[in-house]
Amino acid sequence: MEERDRTGRTGQPQHRINQPSTARERANSVDAYGFQRSDDFDYETHEQLMSEYLAVLTRRSIRWAKLLQGRRRVDRNLKVKRYVRKGVPNEHRPLVWMVCSGAQEQMDRNPGYYQSLLDTHHEPKLEESIRTDLHRTFPDNIYFRKSAEPCLQQALYNVLVAYGHHNKAVGYCQGMNFIAGYLILVSKDEETSFWLMEALLSRILPDYYTPAMLGLKTDQEVLGELVRLKAPAVWKLMQDQGVMWTLVVSRWFICLFIDVLPVETVLRIWDCLFYEGSKILFRVALTLIRHHQQEIAEAQNLPDVCERFKRITRGAFVEDCHTFMQKIFQEPGSLSMATVSKLRESCRARIIADES
């Protein structure tokens, strides 16, 4: 009979399974969307945030499933708007984005159109511009590497070349590759990505990507006017230092916060962008600036201003996407579409006058 010690255990050696002792060891070095995490990624904070956010995701998933009930339609009402603001589960994003943006209606009206664009003769200049940017698009994402099976670079090329033929006034410009890449990662479907891109570039954000980029320039100036009203200390700093808004926020707008904010935070912003329109971009930008206005206002020179604008897009404030999304509807205060439209009108006129 085996001898036991005073605790009741036998004298046999204990075989222990080595359990990961740190958050870094417990977590994957690649996130849910295929992006390689950086060397300085804060695994401890991420683990803490995800332990809370996973519970939120589970609740949202149950409520969305009950709301949709297997239907391929999404109503426009206060309840759905509230649901969208609280986050669309990833499994429902393609459907919700397509329906809410009007992209589904456009696709249904034009069966076979996407394939016809791929079958047409491709303009050499368009092809060359797109191919040049393919390897620069998300090199840190395992699904866009040439070794991936399938490699999403081909899907990305198809969507971009199709859009270039569809909208010849725009063709292709840098920034569009990142937007198309995110759409492909979420929808996992080329044609869906094409129609979502058409909704974004043609209707939600008109003139952002045309050669003159008048819409983009206008909205950067509109942000400046909103900062003057809602974060005057930052506006004064920008005036005193002679810093143009395009220098610090152009990437926010042209890439729709891709590679600026964390992936899940960007997708939560896009949930609202597809449902509520471009006004959401101003809410995000104003929240980042207002929340950090004291830090920004202490900048001493131009490089310091630029560095502080980079710094405010990192850290726990933006990593906690659920709390951040609540903040964007609180921190900037009232922001009506009528106000945005009026500011756009005056800023656009000023830009045209300055450039003529």
UniProtKB/Swiss-Prot annotation:
Chain segments carrying region Disordered: 1-29
Keyword line: GTPase activation
Assigned GO CC terms: cytoplasm; plasma membrane
Parts of the chain that traverse the membrane: none
GO terms assigned for molecular function: GTPase activator activity
Domain Rab-GAP TBC: 87-277
Protein name as annotated: Growth hormone-regulated TBC protein 1-A
Gene name in the database record: grtp1a
